[in-house]
Amino acid sequence: MILLLTGMPGSGKGVVAREFEKRGIPVVSMGDAIREEAEKRGIPKTPEGLKEVSLKVREELGPGAVAILTVPKVRKLLELNPVVVVEGVRSPYEVEEFRKEFKNEEIKVVAIHSSPKSRFQRLLKRQRSDDPKTWEEFVERDRKELNFGIGEVIALADYIIVNECGFDQLKANIEKLISMIFDGKI
């Protein structure tokens, strides 16, 4: 089984991915695929450099490019693990690419949802170089993500984890999802 994690920036995808890893479930990061590609091409791993690489690979491989870059890692991990998590799926084209490449695998989309206010506060605390510093920048970034297609992926998710009530509740929601997976209920 492949779980495709999606969610708006600051929703908690990385936190959820780390919780899966703590339970021995391997995680492949779509963002890492872009960072690795930047390194191969000798492009700095700055926000501008990563955006440049993202655009170039999409020009070369099509709109599902980042998924294409992660397929070899996912395939290798599936040889040894019953479940693999892919963190950071952002477009319907990427979901379609995984479905095309892994026809014999069960694929589920898991969306992490948080309110805009909660996400903005998390991004301010996180302080990554590419995180918005103002509400206006945050709204613009959300608009770009939605134009990219992430809203459609979230809307069509098989399972939604709400991340509003603190870390303990988030962990409980993740535990519930993992139990459902291994009990064959998802």
UniProtKB/Swiss-Prot annotation:
Keyword Cytoplasm: no
GO MF, one annotated term: ATP binding
Amino-acid positions noted as binding ATP in the UniProt annotation, renumbered to this chain: G7, M8, P9, G10, S11, G12, K13, G14
Keyword vocabulary terms for this entry: ATP-binding, Nucleotide-binding
Highest taxon of the lineage: Archaea
Family, similarity comment: Belongs to the UPF0200 family.
Protein name: UPF0200 protein PF1294
